[in-house]
Swiss-Prot record:
Underlying gene: rplU
Record-given protein name: Large ribosomal subunit protein bL21
Stretches with biased composition (Basic and acidic residues): 116-128
Description of how the protein assembles with itself and partners: Part of the 50S ribosomal subunit. Contacts protein L20.
Entry's Gene Ontology molecular function annotations: rRNA binding; structural constituent of ribosome
Key word Heme present: no
Organism, as annotated: Nitrobacter hamburgensis (strain DSM 10229 / NCIMB 13809 / X14)
Length: 128
């Protein structure tokens, strides 16, 4: 099953376990957020929204908040000793799609457990 969602003025085709970089949204790292603007639900019988599919949403886990690459806007007017250089970086949220929900259901999956780091003793330590 897939869905086409709209967030931040852009549309994304998603399936469960997709990792997605979108414009910054509210939510702490590790929490589940719901994206409610579902335009299309695909599968055995596709459902097209007019403009959105009623009762459908997509649940996603917030993996990270970060800043995107620097975009430089440089303007130069030749032979005029005039130039302007500006740059900016977008705020980005990285999401993992956990579930595609139809008919007003709520997410059943909580945040994934974090893997514990196993620290092995270095050679020579431990047998004195």
């Amino acid at each position: 099953m897939f869905a086409v969602i709209k967030t931040g003025g852009r549309q994304y085709r998603v399936v469960p376990d997709d990792v997605l970089e979108i414009g910054k949204i509210a939510g702490d790292v590790g929490t589940i957020v719901q994206l409610g603007e579902v335009l299309v639900l695909g599968g055995d019988t596709p459902v097209l929204g007019l403009p959105t599919v009623a009762g459908a949403s997509v649940a996603a886990e917030v993996l990270q908040h970060k800043r995107g690459p620097k975009v430089i806007a440089f303007k130069k007017r030749r032979r005029k000793h005039s130039k302007r250089k500006r740059g900016y970086r977008d705020e980005i949220t990285v999401l993992r799609i956990t579930e595609i929900l139809a008919d007003g259901k709520t997410p059943t999956v909580g945040p994934r457990p974090k893997k514990e780091k196993v620290v092995e003793p270095a050679e020579g330590e431990g047998d004195h």
